[in-house]
């Protein structure tokens, strides 16, 4: 079995996913590139919300925390515990910012699709939507995760990291290699599919029935959106921890 062509085909499949389109989209032409404006606009809003809220709340820490400071400390503690559980007490520290950034961006992005008024910014085509309902965003989040667990394993074990591919037997070499190359594909599709499906269901219900009827579905969507952010962050941390511990 030839491993290299399979790995190349897997990477090519991830690249080809960037051309997937669902519904109407609004594009900007920047130089020779076509940029998905809906994703960029909502992503900038999400980043502004995260940076703005963090700056306002923690720029002047109090000995007796305010409600906002308490909330951010709770979020940080939650992310730290999640990272520690998946990576291990000795190694988790440097990875808290990475896992925290992934979790918070995905969480707020997922919720933005349901909470941000879709007509808050008028676009020539289409409407604002969650950045994570676009495959380009989820691939862009999954690829750094892949780089992170390769980096974690190599920095911890050196070239000996690649010995895991022939464990427990060399005959599993092709499968073990493909497993690592398909992880970003799995992360991308899981997040993209769930968020897109949730938004499509809400849009269909809103167009077919009165406004109050889809509200329970919207609340369910908020719950599942939070769960998807947690799953992505947990898997990212688990992959990093696995790469430093060895093959399981």
From Swiss-Prot:
Compartments, record wording: Plastid, Chloroplast thylakoid membrane
GO CC annotations on file: chloroplast thylakoid membrane; plasma membrane; proton-transporting ATP synthase complex
Example GO molecular function: proton-transporting ATP synthase activity, rotational mechanism
Annotated InterPro entries: ATP_syn_F0_a_bact/chloroplast, ATP_synth_F0_asu, ATP_synth_F0_asu_AS, F0_ATP_A_sf
Alphabetical list of SUPFAM superfamilies matching this protein: F1F0 ATP synthase subunit A
Cited Pfam families: ATP-synt_A
TM region(s), chain numbering: 38-58, 96-116, 135-155, 200-220, 221-241
Gene3D superfamilies, per the entry: ATP synthase, F0 complex, subunit A
Signal peptide as annotated in the record: none
Membrane topology: Multi-pass membrane protein
Top-level taxonomic group: Eukaryota
Similarity field: Belongs to the ATPase A chain family.
Function: Key component of the proton channel; it plays a direct role in the translocation of protons across the membrane.
Protein name (record): ATP synthase subunit a, chloroplastic
Provenance organism: Amborella trichopoda
Lineage of source species: Eukaryota, Viridiplantae, Streptophyta, Embryophyta, Tracheophyta
Gene it is expressed from: atpI
């Amino acid at each position: 079995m030839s491993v290299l062509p399979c790995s190349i085909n897997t990477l090519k499949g991830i690249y080809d996913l960037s051309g997937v389109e669902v519904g109407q989209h609004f594009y900007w032409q920047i130089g020779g590139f076509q940029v998905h404006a809906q994703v960029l606009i909502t992503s900038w809003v999400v980043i502004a919300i995260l940076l703005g809220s963090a700056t306002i709340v923690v720029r002047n820490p109090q000995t007796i925390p305010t409600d906002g400071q308490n909330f951010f400390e709770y979020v940080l503690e939650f992310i730290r515990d999640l990272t520690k559980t998946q990576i291990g007490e000795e190694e988790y520290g440097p990875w808290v910012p990475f896992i925290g950034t992934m979790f918070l961006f995905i969480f707020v992005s997922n919720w933005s699709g349901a909470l941000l008024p879709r007509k808050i910014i008028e676009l020539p085509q289409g409407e604002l939507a969650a950045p994570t309902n676009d495959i380009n965003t989820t691939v862009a989040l999954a690829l750094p995760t892949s780089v992170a667990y390769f980096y974690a394993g190599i920095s911890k074990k050196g070239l000996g990291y690649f010995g895991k591919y022939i464990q427990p037997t060399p005959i599993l070499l092709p499968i073990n290699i493909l497993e690592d190359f398909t992880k970003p594909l799995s992360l991308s599709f899981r997040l993209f599919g769930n968020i897109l499906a949730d938004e499509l269901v809400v849009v269909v219900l809103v167009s077919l029935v009165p406004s109050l009827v889809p509200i329970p579905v919207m609340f369910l969507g908020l719950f599942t959106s939070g769960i998807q952010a947690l799953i992505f962050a947990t898997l990212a941390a688990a992959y990093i921890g696995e790469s430093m511990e060895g093959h399981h």
